[in-house]
Amino acid sequence: VHVQLNTKSKIFSSDNNGFGNQPNSDVGAITMAHPGTLPLVSKEVIDMGMKLGIALGGTITRNLVFDRKNYFYPDLPKGYQITQDATPICKGGTVKIRRDDCPHFDIKLTKIHLEEDAGKSIHVKNTDFTNLDLNRSGVPLLEIVTEPMIASSEQAGLCLTELRKLVRYLDISDGNMERGSLRLSLIHISEPTRPY
């Protein structure tokens, strides 16, 4: 689950973090990785990551370490993404599903880590053209990684609903899925004896 954070600036620069602004108007030298620029992580982003980790019962890491994930994609102007891999801001934790209309269950978390978002490709209808809006590039994200224990689409939906309520309650994200503030990537893992 990717959670876009409600911050005034981007994760590693003072560029504006706003939704719906004129395309490519909130992109500065650090976001573009111009020579001589150095990223500096936002304290506000760190605080939000710790707040969510504590709320989910995880263990907060004492040292922040960031990695470069290198890949080429048109909406990634630097050619790499700054993320956390081996040393996430939070390890473990649990999303507790407690509702009257279904059995109670827990979804265990592997980690919560900080990273920057990529830009946005906008495919122009009825043409072969794709436009790029790099305003989203560098926007702070929390990525929540669960253990492979979600057994159904219903459980996935309940987990996402609980996370959405929590990030809104903690005021770290508006959780607006329509605007991309809360995004979900599913990976299907099946047992060898039970394919799909």
Where on the chain are the PLM-derived regions?
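Basic, nucleic-acid-interacting segments
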Residues: 2-185, 190, 194
